Amino acid sequence: MERAEKNKMTKYEVLKKYFGYDSFREGQEMLVDALLSGQDVLGIMPTGAGKSLCYQIPALLLPGITLVVSPLISLMKDQVSTLNQAGVHAAFLNSSLSAAQYRKALGFAMEGRYKIIYVAPERLLTPEFLYAVQSMEISMISVDEAHCISQWGQDFRPSYLKITEFVDQLPTRPVIGAFTATATKEVRDDIEALLSLRDPVRLVTGFDRKNLKFTVQQPKDKFAAAESFLAEHEADCGIIYCLTRKNVEEVCEKLEQKGYSVTRYHAGLSDLERKENQEDFIYDRKQIMVATNAFGMGIDKSNVRYVIHYNMPKNMESYYQEAGRAGRDGLPAEYILLYAGQDVITNQFFIENMAQESEDPETTALIRQREEKRLKKMTFYCFTHECLRDYILRYFGEYGSNYCGNCSNCLSEFETVDVTVAAKAILGCVRECRQRYGTTVILDTLHGANTAKIRQYHMDENSHYGELSKEPVYRLRQILNELQVREYLYVTADTYSIVRLLPKASELLDEDGTMLMKMAKEEKRIPKAAKEKTKTKTSAAAKDLSNEEAAVFEKLRALRMELAKEHKVPPYIIFSDKTLIQMAMEKPSNKEEMLAVSGVGESKFEKYGEPFLACLAER
């Protein structure tokens, strides 16, 4: 596209021609207009809300070049591939290029051949890059994953702090846009200050992603729980996050033995193997990615239908960001967290052994305290009987509804139960043994277990021994968890976790206090809706289609895979599942009708339109 042609086009024409959309989503147009008028912006928008378009459209309408600062090579490659497929001249500059490739790309940039250049923050202050930008007309800088600039953020990158130094060395200051999906108020304030944004237009569209269903389970056998879900979603792709490399290897190996299409990703693999495994997942050659949190930031794969956390993450920010990798196309997606008490201990170990964040010991201690508070909030999320979505939104400073109708708590049946007797027994048992043992010993004592450990510790002589023998152990564990949430007790996160009393415990032990709590009516705490699912070879994305439409959708998916292999691009870059579903429902029969489908722009139609029309014409 020639510069003159771009500048004659309106934002709506650019939106339709290059991206295939007829209208902007919530908040997009406001940020586009601000950047076009020369105002800095700060956009906090949930994953899948279309942050990229907020700077890509101004980039095509403004003169000169837009630089996009991006933290990950995979994200840059993904975005550039998507833009090139849409007919936009874009490139990336990072360490994946050889010296010759880098110089060639930089030369093309100086000649004005690109409208959008993605660059790693580490490259900004290199002499070669600084020299090159002096002769470029840089009209805008967009900072992607802007939370990386904040030490309050979950992915702090010191290299992001160099962005303002780079801007100061440009001949003229360009307009600056900062974008992220997950940022508390502290992080937002940091972004504004550390990027020196000038009276920015701020947009926080909200953190709620209504297409995500949230589920928390506390299964006895995590692998069995995960496999049960996977068996019901054979046609879908998803991510399983584990806390440790060992977990990744174990889960991946077990799934391979069961015949699943699975690969893995963690920092212990070679660069080449990580790259190959990531591409296998992105190109749909493998359906399941088992990974540590080293995988995912910047992955733009739109057709991920589920994320399973095999272990509880360290904080709500990480949890919600990783959940955001499912359902980016706006179609229904599921997010499942499998909790066990060991997860808290593992995370606490990571906090205690985290790298020195500051030369000042006091600052390091404060950072660790902050991380421990975040871990506590994350743990309480796993225990709550309230709406999970509302818990998440309140954590990020928003207020939702007490009932979302799309989380495991809202879909389960609860009753309010007086648990005073059990709560007092738990607290009394802990006090009588002088707060020396962990949850398993305490619960086994109350249940009257006759084990070697109970006898060794003389817990069979505790006055509360066997007092709650008729209560299911899982219910006792629920009550103990609730006592933590209400701060009657806490469980240390040492190698051998110990149950300790807090001052508030005396309110129940020594006074006439009562304790009521919500408890699931059924012993199985998995929602009924989840139990009624059956095996299907059709993607969950197509669940609302008729049988005929679902069959057409699967044919379109097969064609997309063929074209992806032929053009060597990820399938979702050709067309998203959402676009294919609209095709299956509306069955366009000519170019005009095909261009009316959301996500089909002129450039995409020229490349792929005819094969899809031919597929739709088959009966």
What are these regions (language model features)?
Residues L97, F179-A183, Q218, L269, ...:
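Catalytic cores of large soluble enzymes that bind and process phosphate-bearing ligands
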Residues L366-F396:
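Short, charged low-complexity linear segments at domain edges
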Residues E2-Y18, D22, E26, M30-S52, ...:
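Helicase motor core with emphasis on the C-terminal RecA-like subdomain
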Residues E2-K11, E359-P361, R370-E372, L388-D390, ...:
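Accessory DNA-binding and partner-docking regions appended to nucleic-acid-acting proteins
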